Amino acid sequence: MKFLGIDYGQRRTGIAVTDAGGRMAFPRRTIAMTTRDAFFVELLGMVEVECPDAFVVGLPRLPGGEETLTTRQVRNFVERLKRRTTLPVYFMPEELSSFEAEDDLRDAGLRGRRLEAVVDQQAAVRILESFLAVPEERRSLA
């Protein structure tokens, strides 16, 4: 199966995809949040190009598992996404994926705008890699 990973954010959303066999994840793009409609037009356009079988959306929580405002925003986004597509949506618990991705990219020498342009994509890659490591029977549909 091919998955499209999403690191949803209020300002920017990182997108990554797996290969057709669902074994490796690759960064694709960052979608800037201008308006909700424009955002979904761009996201669904990527779905037409990439042809994924399902979405994997990072679900941020505090280290103790408590939900936050950001968690609720992601859940609301997923509900809007499910109204626009018939593809299944999986949640992948994530803690600090964006911070870890930023650290890795800084270590690789990226700074400023170059870093900002790809950090959300790299966070989406991390979300997909974590998801792919989970046995299928333990994956959680949204």
From Swiss-Prot:
<protein>
    <recommendedName>
        <fullName>Putative pre-16S rRNA nuclease</fullName>
        <ecNumber>3.1.-.-</ecNumber>
    </recommendedName>
</protein>
<dbReference type="InterPro" id="IPR037027">
    <property type="entry name" value="YqgF/RNaseH-like_dom_sf"/>
</dbReference>
<dbReference type="InterPro" id="IPR005227">
    <property type="entry name" value="YqgF"/>
</dbReference>
<dbReference type="InterPro" id="IPR012337">
    <property type="entry name" value="RNaseH-like_sf"/>
</dbReference>
<dbReference type="InterPro" id="IPR006641">
    <property type="entry name" value="YqgF/RNaseH-like_dom"/>
</dbReference>
<comment type="similarity">
    <text>Belongs to the YqgF nuclease family.</text>
</comment>
<keyword id="KW-0540">Nuclease</keyword>
<dbReference type="GO" id="GO:0000967">
    <property type="term" value="P:rRNA 5'-end processing"/>
</dbReference>
<keyword id="KW-0378">Hydrolase</keyword>
<dbReference type="Pfam" id="PF03652">
    <property type="entry name" value="RuvX"/>
</dbReference>
<keyword id="KW-0963">Cytoplasm</keyword>
<comment type="function">
    <text>Could be a nuclease involved in processing of the 5'-end of pre-16S rRNA.</text>
</comment>
<dbReference type="GO" id="GO:0004518">
    <property type="term" value="F:nuclease activity"/>
</dbReference>
<keyword id="KW-0690">Ribosome biogenesis</keyword>
<dbReference type="GO" id="GO:0005829">
    <property type="term" value="C:cytosol"/>
</dbReference>
